């Protein structure tokens, strides 16, 4: 999701929840994303994942930003939508994992623990390095 504020392009990024990401900032932020369901169209998956992770449906026509491959080999098909989102209203889905490791105890964590509007320069500094290309594609799309 992106918006313009005072003539400047802002992008909405999310920070992953859970203990692995707790104290990480630079290189940890990401676009809201997730897995395709069987026979699901990429744009439908993008809407569903945005709603799951942010608690809000973007609802508008999505503009394709193309595909990238992340460091671990995960393929990401990205879309952009212009809109408004109050980061204080973030309501992410959750996941469960054993924590601490080998403790036998399960703990529930939000998939996304925070969201933030950032300038493109701020986003370039904080986003997963493999997703920087998506920021440039957004700039190209909106100029």
Question: For the regions a protein language model found, what residue spans apply to each?
Answer:
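Short, charged/polar surface micro-motifs in flexible loops or helix N-caps
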Residues: 6-7, 18-21, 37-38, 72-73, ...
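Non-DNA-binding regulatory cores of transcription-related proteins
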Residues: 107-113
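Residues that scaffold the ATP/ADP-binding catalytic core of kinase and kinase-like folds
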Residues: 23, 39, 126
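The catalytic Nudix box helix
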Residues: 31-65, 119
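Charged phosphate-binding loop/patch that engages nucleotide di/tri-phosphates or the phosphate backbone
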Residues: 116, 120-143
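N-terminal strand-loop-strand
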Residues: 1-30, 79
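Active-site-adjacent beta-strand/loop module that shapes the phosphate/pyrophosphate-binding cleft
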Residues: 67-104, 116-118, 138-139
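Short connector loops at helix/strand junctions that flank enzyme active sites
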Residues: 26, 31, 59, 73-76
């Amino acid at each position: 999701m992106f918006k313009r504020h005072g003539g400047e392009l802002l992008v909405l990024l999310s920070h992953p929840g859970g203990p692995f990401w707790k104290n990480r900032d630079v290189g940890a932020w990401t676009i809201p994303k997730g897995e395709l369901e069987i026979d699901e169209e990429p744009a439908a998956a993008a809407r569903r994942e945005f709603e799951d992770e942010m608690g809000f449906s973007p609802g508008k026509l999505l503009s394709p930003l193309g595909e990238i491959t992340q460091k671990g080999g995960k393929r990401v098909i990205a879309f952009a939508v212009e809109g408004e989102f109050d980061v204080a209203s973030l309501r992410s889905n959750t996941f469960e994992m054993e924590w601490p490791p080998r403790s036998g105890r399960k703990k529930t964590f939000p998939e996304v623990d925070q969201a933030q509007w950032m300038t493109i320069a701020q986003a370039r500094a904080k986003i997963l390095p493999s997703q920087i290309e998506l920021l440039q594609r957004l700039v190209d799309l909106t100029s």
